[in-house]
């Protein structure tokens, strides 16, 4: 296994690479991967692709079928209760992926075929299923219905518009932000301001030395302006 920086991922794919596993949007700072470049590099060398869409599903347009596997935690931008997650596997790859963790719901005949050795699994994706957390997925059903009603294009436009407003406001106030068009805005070295924002009722996080602020469907321009108000202008660095 090799770990490479995000910007070098596509160039790091080699003829000996079997699988490229990466996140569409980075949890640490919100950067968006060059999805097309990584897919092209993987295809050129016959490598499989596994995309973690946890930080993008729910606001970023994605075609799951463009990747051999996708995995997604539901509790982020999909607004699902904790305990929900989703896996997609292309039909081609399903034939080569062992169903190692299949439970009774994956049986070809769940109510009769799982007493004794589990010999026959359901065809297709259901053969990978495990018993779900029923209450969590009941909540997920409604969350996903809401997002589907709004539509990914509208969610993307709303979230990235707010993020762009926040990014511009931070730059005007002297802060250095991670560039890009993500719905996640990060300011390196500002993680120490997270408690102050929390006191003001603003929920942000501070991963990997960054102040990370995410915009989604429930946020407004007033929320963005409130963040800028609390942070204020960056204090000038002391001269040497």
Language model segments and positions:
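Pyridoxal 5′-phosphate
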Residues: 1-240
């Amino acid at each position: 296994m090799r770990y490479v920086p995000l910007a070098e991922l596509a160039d790091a794919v080699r003829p000996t690479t079997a699988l490229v596993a990466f996140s569409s949007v980075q949890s640490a700072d919100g950067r968006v991967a060059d999805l097309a470049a990584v897919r092209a590099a993987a295809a050129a060398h016959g490598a499989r692709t596994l995309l973690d869409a946890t930080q993008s599903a729910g606001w970023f347009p994605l075609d799951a079928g463009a990747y051999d596997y996708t995995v997604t935690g539901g509790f982020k931008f999909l607004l699902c209760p904790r305990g929900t997650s989703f896996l997609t596997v292309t039909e081609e790859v399903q034939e080569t992926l062992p169903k190692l963790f299949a439970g009774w719901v994956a049986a070809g005949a769940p109510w009769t075929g799982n007493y004794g050795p589990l010999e026959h699994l359901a065809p297709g994706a259901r053969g990978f299923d495990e018993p779900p957390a029923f209450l969590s997925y009941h909540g997920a059903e409604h969350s996903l219905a809401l997002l589907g009603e709004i539509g990914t294009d509208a969610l993307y436009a709303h979230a990235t518009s707010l993020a762009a407003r926040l990014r511009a406001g931070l730059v005007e106030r002297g802060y250095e932000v991670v560039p890009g068009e993500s719905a996640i805005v990060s300011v390196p070295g500002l993680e120490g301001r997270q408690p102050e924002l929390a006191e003001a009722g603003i929920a942000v996080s501070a991963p990997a030395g960054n102040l990370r602020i995410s915009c989604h469907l429930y946020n407004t321009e007033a929320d963005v302006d409130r963040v800028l108000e609390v942070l204020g202008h960056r204090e000038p660095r002391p001269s040497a």
